[in-house]
Amino acid sequence: MSFIEKLKNAWVSNNSLLCIGLDPDTEKFPDLFKTMAKPEAVFAFNKAIIDATHDLVCAYKPQIAYFSAEAAETSLEQTIAYIKTQYPHIPVILDAKRGDIGSTAQKYAAEAFERYQADAVTVNPYLGLDSITPFTAYRERGTILLCRTSNSGAADLQDLSVDGIPLYQKVAITARDHWNSHNNCLLVVGATWPEQMAAIRQLVGDMPFLVPGVGAQGGDVNAMVKAGKTADGNGLIISSSRAVLYASNGDDFAQAARAVALSLRQQINVARA
């Protein structure tokens, strides 16, 4: 089953557009993990979060830097393998934001799709087509291109005018017309920019969006969903990380994470009704 098919099924089966970002920061872990080696703690923490929320999400999104910074790449492999074994209907997005020349991009694609067995990966399109093709060549996997990101500095480059339109719109149009020949491209569009999201939706039709910026970054759920949803009420992978993962630093952290995830899913579903 392709990533896009898996995603569409998860939207329906879990009645959810919510994605939980797995950004394991060991300094924020509850005390019960403090006696473990960091890689062991990372996997144990992720496992508890996944077990508590698997029926509430349309995807999980591990951020690779949080694993590599702790020398916990093995924990990343374990985390993805656990999801695929226990909850195989839930797709996994590797948040790596890779971007390099073609030969190196081939290795980054192999890392994401062969080593880690991710269903999709985030990619920086700044280097153009030859840096993207090695990812989209994996036709059953998803390539998620940075378009209008959620951070405060996004406008520094993304709003620059290119051929009379903002650069982020140029990226969206180029993805639509030239990079999506296998229908496996998606776009990163931040929740913090609903007006820009609406403009991108008009440009790319039903192409799915990965939407960071909900929760700790302060994106407005109602405005974002109304701006970005497709005609069928889907089309979005709305990611929240810190607000869910660190809802509690006590032994009830997993239950607290579930409560926040349940609330977020409900907010999203009300907005898309």
From Swiss-Prot:
Single GO MF annotation: orotidine-5'-phosphate decarboxylase activity
Pathway(s) annotated for this protein in UniProt? Pyrimidine metabolism; UMP biosynthesis via de novo pathway; UMP from orotate: step 2/2
Keyword entries, A-Z: Decarboxylase, Lyase, Pyrimidine biosynthesis
Catalytic activity field: orotidine 5'-phosphate + H(+) = UMP + CO2
Cite the EC number. Answer: 4.1.1.23
Q: A GO BP term, please?
A: 'de novo' UMP biosynthetic process
Active-site residues from the entry = K97
Q: Which SMART domains match?
A: OMPdecase
| Family recorded in the similarity comment | Belongs to the OMP decarboxylase family. Type 2 subfamily.
Which protein, by its recorded name, is this?
Orotidine 5'-phosphate decarboxylase
Native organism: Cellvibrio japonicus (strain Ueda107)
Supply the gene name: pyrF
